[in-house]
Amino acid sequence: MTIPFSSIAVIGAGTMGSGIAGQIANAGHSVLLLDLPAEGDDPNAASSRAIERLLKSDPPSLMDKKRAELIECGNTRDDFDRLAQCDWIIEAVVERLDIKKELYKRLDSVIRPDCVVTSNTSTIPISLLVEDMPGSFRERFAITHYFNPVRYMRLLELVRGEETSPAIMEKLADYNDRFLGKGVVPCGDTPGFLGNRVGVYALQVGLDEAHRQNLTVEEADAIMGRPMGIPKTGVFGLYDLIGIDLMADVVDTLENILPQGDAFFAVGKDGPVAPLIASMIAEGYTGDKGKGGFYRLAGDGSENAINLGDGSTRPRTKTLPALAEAAAMLQASGDAVSYTHLRAHETSL
């Protein structure tokens, strides 16, 4: 079987970068995973910790723990020149345009003429990413936006730039389909593409509505989970899974590139939960990858949840099954779902 790419690297060993590397390893292919050099004796500590997280993840990110042996750790100081051997490099660094642009310029000085470079950006248009790059780079550049968790989320948004070679788009679609098991969806070069243009707005509305309706995070997640077409994590659990800091960057990026007057601004950085999110990030509560987020562990190992009103924590409570059941019934009937409806319906169950 012909493999479109024989030497692959991922730059950025965060949740998404490590997940992408893990799925490449699941396909039986080796991959180089780079991150910033760490202080101390082990400059590869960031990428090494990423592999440890893959091995401990639940549900499992790797089909077999031995697949981790196919992921080679490195850092962008000592191993950057090794990228000259690659024919596909996936950028999965922080969602900031300035950092991505700086990386591309550095890449252009070392990569071989036929190397394909793609970004895992979830929101930034390709026209902005490569606006300062030469034509030879732009024709080999595309966006491959995976979703978290990479092993289980089948969708891949594939975005072509004005100058991207059609042959390269075919190679990317072929590899992701045949080897990574992705459902490849071609997307236009618009802010947020398809998934995040709709999905991030929906999540932000969920945060604001929970605050406005005076819901607990548990109640909100029971209501705005499966009945609303959102994963069983619900809104706040999904925020924790994605990363609260990453979501803040995504919101910031969308506000910087969407036209003034777009409905997104009403639920973005000016939303009622925004100050709480900013303070959580400042204190290191960035979600599952950090000290916790809207849900977090107490010192005794028990689960706590945050109060949206004042940011205090309390023991996590189980929501009444009637809430989720009522939401599902209301959704099936086509009625508008509100907390008042749910409480009334709960009483009748």
PLM regions: where:
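NAD(P)+-binding Rossmann beta1-loop-alpha1 motif at the extreme N-terminus of oxidoreductases
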Residues: 1-53, 110
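Amphipathic alpha-helical segments at domain termini/boundaries
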Residues: 26, 33, 63-88, 171-181, ...
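Rossmann-like NAD(P)-binding element
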Residues: 37-42, 55-117, 124-126, 291
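Rossmann-fold dinucleotide-binding core
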Residues: 113-197, 232, 315-317
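Rossmann-like dinucleotide-binding core of oxidoreductases
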Residues: 192, 197, 201-222
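Interdomain hinge/lid region at the active-site interface
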Residues: 222, 226-299, 304
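Intrinsic disorder at enzyme termini
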Residues: 286, 293, 299-328
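Conserved small/polar residues in nucleotide/adenosyl-binding loops
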Residues: 340-347
